[in-house]
Regions:
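Aromatic-capped interface at the extracytoplasmic side
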Residues: 20-39
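Short extracytoplasmic
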Residues: 38-72
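N-terminal post-signal-peptidase region of extra-cytosolic proteins
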Residues: 20, 67-82, 103, 147-152
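Single-pass alpha-helical transmembrane signal-anchor segments
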Residues: 4-26
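Amphipathic, coiled-coil-like alpha-helical scaffolding segments used for oligomerization/assembly
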Residues: 81-83, 89, 95, 113-179
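Short beta-strands and strand-coil junctions in structured, solvent-facing domains, enriched
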Residues: 26, 43-45, 79, 100-103, ...
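Long, charge-rich amphipathic alpha-helical coiled-coil "stalk/tentacle" segments
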Residues: 176-198
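Solvent-exposed, non-transmembrane alpha-helical starts
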Residues: 102-106, 114
């Protein structure tokens, strides 16, 4: 029993030291994450399986990325249709990081990724909406238009280690000044009709 007490006194500081230093050489990759390891800024390896992993203390750096489906909710943008009508459209894009190394080297973080997605999808949508009239955009061919936007955007996002899963128009409205004139015209027409019945 005395031998056990002496050995515990010797090993307790060692155990405490290992416990304190363990974050420098151990890290956990969650099941919703993937990670890349860099050594002094140079890529070493990718970890895509969840669990406990090791790294060289103080030399290797771990950068974790989400491997779930993420979404980008873009602010409204103004587009011109084939029949020269202006539309205010906002969209939502669902995407995923498929190559963490390319993602890390090209955009590095979610804020930059969201900006890049907004720019690319906005550009593709501007090109696609310019080939359709306002009725097709609002009612008739919205699915077809969004499929074309997705195809064009997906190809461009591969260069950033991202895969576009879906793009949807949340809202498509006329600009506020046009809405006001439409409402004024509707009110004038209704009052003209009501005067006929008096």
């Amino acid at each position: 029993m005395r031998f056990l007490k002496i050995n515990m006194k010797k090993f307790l500081p060692i155990l405490l030291l290992v416990f304190v230093l363990s974050p420098t050489f151990l890290f956990v990759v969650d099941e919703t994450q993937q990670a890349i390891i860099t050594e002094l800024g140079e890529y070493k390896r990718t970890i895509s399986k969840p669990g406990l992993s090791f790294k060289k203390p103080f030399i290797e750096k771990v950068t974790k990325f989400d491997n779930r489906i993420l979404s980008t909710d873009a602010p409204p943008g103004e587009y011109l249709t084939l029949d020269k009508k202006r539309l205010v459209v906002d969209f939502i894009a669902r995407w995923k990081i498929v190559d963490p190394l390319v993602f890390f080297k090209s955009v590095n973080n979610l804020f930059s990724a969201n900006s890049r997605i907004e720019d690319i999808v906005f550009s593709e949508m501007r090109e696609e909406l310019a080939t359709h009239n306002i009725n097709e955009v609002i009612a008739e061919n919205r699915e077809l238009i969004m499929d074309e936007v997705k195809i064009g955007s997906t190809e461009r996002l591969k260069d950033f280690g991202m895969e576009l899963i879906d793009v949807r128009i949340k809202r498509a409205d006329l600009p506020s000044e046009v809405q006001r004139s439409v409402f004024d015209r509707m009110i004038a027409e209704r009052s003209r009709i009501s005067k006929r019945y008096r």
